[in-house]
């Protein structure tokens, strides 16, 4: 049997509990990736315009925005398996209810289901990174986080391939039943697959941190406020930028370049193959290039690709515009996603063990709040017919601001002793 490369062999050495957790994440991500790829197109086929799609989609983020920080404060130092187990049951249920409500034309019910889906996703998102770090030996943190991020790419590949295959078939007659394979069918199949996640989460151990939170669960130590603020600034910038444009890329290709949902899914699958590979080599890239190369370098190139993709709208009648936009789309996501494991590890190292649940919750609140606000902003901008390229330009500016903010965290973490990098909090955030 041929020997695996050294960087890939490190994944084989991960504990079984980490692999179980990653498998559960993969099944949950089948739902979220399917929604990312196809939900807007499904809503468009149901007769909703861009503003209505943005308004309905934004409901997913309201619950997380309002409840994430209280949830993070309460979960500090507590067992995480039960909240994640409950979330893994509720998330597929509410996703299925949302899908069926839209399909039945019951938009008021759909709005409530989207809100409930956001709450159930909150339980999963707040505990995900802290749970992964509790399950993983410190020396294997980079590989564990990269594997978790790679589950998104793997789920997206499955969703894209399934969408392309089903929509390529179009329809099928079985025993007198006429089955139509469209965006709804793909969303339904992948949502049902997500019901396997609770069975995997139920088999996980339930470790608690060595240092439990002391004091009332709402209390945050005074010295931690500056630490938390510095850690969250990059997330605010990047989440707001992403919310303005990334969640609507499928609409950009549909409206500007008249790309079909099947073609978009196929290109998305190609991109996610690269995301999967790029995510797995993140630990090796970080070892060779350091934090700056793994975060600042790859994100800067990704921003340039996003700008180029947006500017193709100005020349959309030219034959080269669509190929250039597709190439930028395929390459941008792997590079931007490649920084994800590194930024998560950097942030968790920066804030220390006692603040991980709180930072994870704050990140969830920021992403949800930013995406909700950005979706509403996008709704207004598109109502006034602002072109997509201008939206992408704003996104790029915000991305660059967030990327440069990470440099401040990198400088602080690099000044610390390597032995303390995984667990010790920064005692002097004012030096950042």
How would you describe each model-predicted region?
Residues 4-65, 229-268:
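Helix-loop boundary and gating motifs at the non-cytosolic
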Residues 145-167, 364-375:
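Glycine-rich segments within core transmembrane alpha-helices of 12-TM secondary carriers
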């Amino acid at each position: 049997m041929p020997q695996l490369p050294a960087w890939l062999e490190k994944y084989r050495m991960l504990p079984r509990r980490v692999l179980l957790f990653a498998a559960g994440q993969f099944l949950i991500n089948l739902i979220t990736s399917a929604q990312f790829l196809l939900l807007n197109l499904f809503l468009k086929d149901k007769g909703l315009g861009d503003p209505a799609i943005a308004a309905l989609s934004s409901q997913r983020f309201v619950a997380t925005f309002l409840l994430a920080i209280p949830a993070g404060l309460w979960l500090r130092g507590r067992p995480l398996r039960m909240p994640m187990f409950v979330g893994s049951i509720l998330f597929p249920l509410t996703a299925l209810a949302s899908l069926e409500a839209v399909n039945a034309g019951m938009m008021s019910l759909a709005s409530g289901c989207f809100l409930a889906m956001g709450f159930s996703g909150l339980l999963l998102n707040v505990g995900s990174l802290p749970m992964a770090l509790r399950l993983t030996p410190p020396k294997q943190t980079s590989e564990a986080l990269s594997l978790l991020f790679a589950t998104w790419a793997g789920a997206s590949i499955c969703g894209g391939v399934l969408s392309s295959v089903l929509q390529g078939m179009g329809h099928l007659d079985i025993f007198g039943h006429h089955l139509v394979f469209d965006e709804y069918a793909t969303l339904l199949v992948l949502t049902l697959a997500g019901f396997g996640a609770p069975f995997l989460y139920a088999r996980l151990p339930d470790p608690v941190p060595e240092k439990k939170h002391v004091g009332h669960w709402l209390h945050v130590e005074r010295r931690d406020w500056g630490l938390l603020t510095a850690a969250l600034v990059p997330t605010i910038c990047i989440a707001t930028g992403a919310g303005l444009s990334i969640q609507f890329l499928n609409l950009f290709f549909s409206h500007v370049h008249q790309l079909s949902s099947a073609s978009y899914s196929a290109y998305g699958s190609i991109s996610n193959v690269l995301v999967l590979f790029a995510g797995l080599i993140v630990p090796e890239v970080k070892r060779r290039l350091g934090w700056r190369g793994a975060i600042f370098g790859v994100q800067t190139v990704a921003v340039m690709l996003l700008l180029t993709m947006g500017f193709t709208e100005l020349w959309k009648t030219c034959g080269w515009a669509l190929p250039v936009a597709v190439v930028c789309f395929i390459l941008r996501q792997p590079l931007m996603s490649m920084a994800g494991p590194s930024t998560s590890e950097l942030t968790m190292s920066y804030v220390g063990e006692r603040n991980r649940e709180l930072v994870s919750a704050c990140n969830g609140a920021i992403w949800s709040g930013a995406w909700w606000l950005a979706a509403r902003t996008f709704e207004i901008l598109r109502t006034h017919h602002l072109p997509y390229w201008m939206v992408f330009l704003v996104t790029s500016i915000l991305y660059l601001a967030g990327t440069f903010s990470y440099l401040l965290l990198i400088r602080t973490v690099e000044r610390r002793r390597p032995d303390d990098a995984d667990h010790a909090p920064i005692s002097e955030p004012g030096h950042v």
